[in-house]
Amino acid sequence: MINEIKKDAKERMTKSVESLAHNFGRIRTGQAHPSILEGVMVPYYGADTPIKQVANITVKDARTLQVVAFERNMLGAVDKAIGSAGLNLNPTNLGELLLISMPALTEETRRGFTKQARDVAEDARVAVRNIRRDANSSLKDLVKEKEISEDEERRAAGEIDDLTKKFVAEIDAKLAEKEKDLMAV
């Protein structure tokens, strides 16, 4: 019972950290990276479709993305979708492909992205702490049902606390790395 609760908590905390990394990937650092366009939806036969399903996105160089639509006639729609996605990106249409130059980040935008990164990290910390609370609640329920002793509950709660501290430290390390990337000129 206790091991199942700890295993479940660890898996959920790992997913929270993976989600953090995914969300950090969407925050622009001035470097070209395909994940920047992940949230872009392209109208395709009447339905909004993720850009990855209608185009191939590659990194041409450190500050340029190259987008090639799977269907040539979709290039205009992809161009329009990227331009109107609110990412402050202006694609250059070369007929067969789009080139997207990453604009240099101003000090103000860097600070805004840093604040956004901190908010995302705080959400991940809260998620990890909520998982700890759920696990501790499950342990208390087991004590009430007399399935485990109070000593076992305290020991398991301590292990879950240690696990929580480890994952929060990992979140803090990822945040520090992202802030460093954002503030690098």
From Swiss-Prot:
Localization annotation: Cytoplasm
InterPro entries, per database record: Ribosome_recyc_fac, Ribosome_recyc_fac_dom, RRF_sf
GO biological process: cytoplasmic translational termination
Molecular-function GO terms, alphabetical: ribosomal large subunit binding
Keywords: Cytoplasm, Protein biosynthesis
Cytoplasm among keywords: yes
Chief location: cytoplasm
Pfam family, one: RRF
The organism's place on the tree of life at top rank: Bacteria
Any one cellular-component term (Gene Ontology): cytosol
Family membership: Belongs to the RRF family.
Entries under NCBIfam families matching the protein: frr (TIGR00496)
Function: Responsible for the release of ribosomes from messenger RNA at the termination of protein biosynthesis. May increase the efficiency of translation by recycling ribosomes from one round of translation to another.
The protein's name: Ribosome-recycling factor
Organism: Pseudomonas fluorescens (strain Pf0-1)
Gene encoding the protein: frr
